[in-house]
Regions:
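Active-site-adjacent structural elements that line small-molecule/cofactor binding pockets in enzymes
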Residues: 1-325
Length: 325
């Protein structure tokens, strides 16, 4: 599988003003853009704009939560984008987290494995063109038929942390989307995916958090805030226990559980930042990103973290691009 170099969107600034920036990404050798959906733009709108504006870019969602839209609504959005960008759209589906699903959207965060599996299975059923009347474990559909039939079926990827979801993405989808892991962690994750794939080549897309700055003290401080925000979410805490990172993070977890946020930040060792956030000179960052690929990643989605106030975002993007290698 060829190496694909991607960037996370939406980019900084207003969406209506990003056409030239998307063209610049392609000029610098980026092949993909992958949308992130949290509390800003939805996963699909930035990609719809890019579908019309920049035909050189492949488009992907990383990710669409399985809970916050019904399965037919997800299928309609997927079909529309796949029809707008034939052969260059990938849908990444995942459980998201209890914070986004339950606390923000008021949807019970129950049976995440089954929910994601059922939505993936529904996607396959919907793109068959047949009318669907079926009881899945976590929802039922009665009489739905997807009326848009794209020229090419979209790639379907599963956002995965631990073994269950990784194997699901290998067995029932076209691959997985991973994030918040080190280049060394990829070897363990890729082994699970490839072991469950029955010899079929699978895509492994990684969101890689990067800050190409040598202002180490400032980067460390900002990165620890990001690590605390994510690694205390149960799904990420469980993932890093599985990865063997409990000795590094247990102090933070204990302080956070006790309600002492200041102590939790102080308990995060610099080693955790070095492992989970790529930082340093642009050349060093490119070398570390290459390690992700060597260990099994096939597609990157770089996420530039503005941890250094002196960092110029677009210079950072250019410095990490294939054209800079």
């Amino acid at each position: 599988m060829i190496r694909r170099n991607g960037m996370t969107v939406p980019l900084p600034g207003h969406l209506h003003a990003q056409r030239d920036k998307l063209a610049q990404l392609a000029d610098w050798g980026y092949s993909d853009i992958w949308s992130a959906e949290t509390d800003g733009a939805d996963a699909f709108t930035p990609l719809a704009l890019a579908a019309a504006w920049e035909p050189r870019l492949r488009l992907g969602t990383a990710i669409v939560p399985a809970y916050t839209r019904t399965a037919p609504v997800i299928a309609q959005s997927v079909a529309a984008l796949a029809d707008a960008a034939p052969g260059r759209f990938a849908i990444g589906i995942g459980s998201s987290s209890n914070v986004i699903v339950e606390k923000w959207n008021g949807v019970p965060f129950v049976d995440p494995y089954k929910k994601v599996r059922d939505v993936v299975r529904f996607m396959h059923d919907a793109f068959s063109g047949e009318k669907i009347t079926k009881d899945y474990d976590t929802f039922s559909v009665n009489g739905f038929r997807l009326s848009i039939k794209p020229e090419q079926k979209p790639t379907i990827l599963v956002a995965a942390l631990r073994e269950g979801m990784l194997k699901l993405g290998a067995r029932e989808a076209d691959g997985v989307i991973i994030n918040w892991l080190s280049a060394q962690d990829v070897s363990k994750v890729a082994a699970v995916v490839n072991g469950a794939a029955n010899g079929v080549e699978k895509e492994i897309t990684a969101r890689i958090f990067v800050c190409p700055s040598e202002n180490t003290e400032t980067v460390m401080a900002g990165a620890k805030f990001a690590i605390a925000a994510y690694m205390n979410v149960p799904v990420y805490a469980d993932f890093h226990r599985w990865m063997g990172r409990a000795p590094l993070l247990q102090g933070m977890w204990d302080a956070w559980a006790a309600g002492d946020r200041k102590a939790a930040l102080a308990a995060i060792p610099n080693q955790a930042v070095d492992e989970l956030v790529v930082h340093g000179s642009p050349a060093h960052c490119r070398d570390v990103i290459n390690e992700y690929f060597k260990n099994g990643v096939t597609t990157s989605s770089l996420a530039i973290l503005p941890l250094d106030p002196d960092l110029d975002y677009w210079k950072a993007v250019e410095s990490l691009s294939p054209s800079a290698s």
